[in-house]
Amino acid sequence: MNAWLLSVLCLLGALAVLVEGVTVQDGDLSFPLESVKQLKHLREVQEPTLMSHKKFALRLPKPVAPELCSQSAFPEALRPLCEKPNAEEILQRLEAIAQDPNTCEICAYAACTGC
């Protein structure tokens, strides 16, 4: 009976970890990996607009954080970072993970937990 109860508790614990999934942490903020992956798709949609105005883009780099945060498809879980003064830097780090999320899924980044 005790072995069966212990097995059930272990199984429930493993299930809880799987349901929570992989979390990406940046400072005091943490985000689900699935939300971070959505950044890649948002940037792919945004790229054609930036490329069509190439000659203007060479003058001054335009911050992408306000533009990304204002999109309706921007993940709700990432919204708290939009209010941070260093949102641009945080987005750059998250985009690096979004470009190759497999490395986060195997916990190659120190910022990723829950593997």
Curated annotation (Swiss-Prot):
Transmembrane segments: none annotated. Gene3D superfamilies: Guanylin. Its main location: secreted. It is found in: Secreted. Coiled coil: none annotated. Pfam families: Guanylin (PF02058). The keyword Secreted applies. GO terms for cellular component: extracellular region. The keyword Thylakoid does not apply. GO terms for molecular function: guanylate cyclase activator activity; guanylate cyclase regulator activity. Intestine and in low abundance in adrenal gland, kidney, and uterus/oviduct. Residues 1-23 form the signal peptide. Endogenous activator of intestinal guanylate cyclase. It stimulates this enzyme through the same receptor binding region as the heat-stable enterotoxins. Belongs to the guanylin family. This is Guanylin. It comes from Rattus norvegicus (Rat). The lineage of its organism: Eukaryota, Metazoa, Chordata, Craniata, Vertebrata.
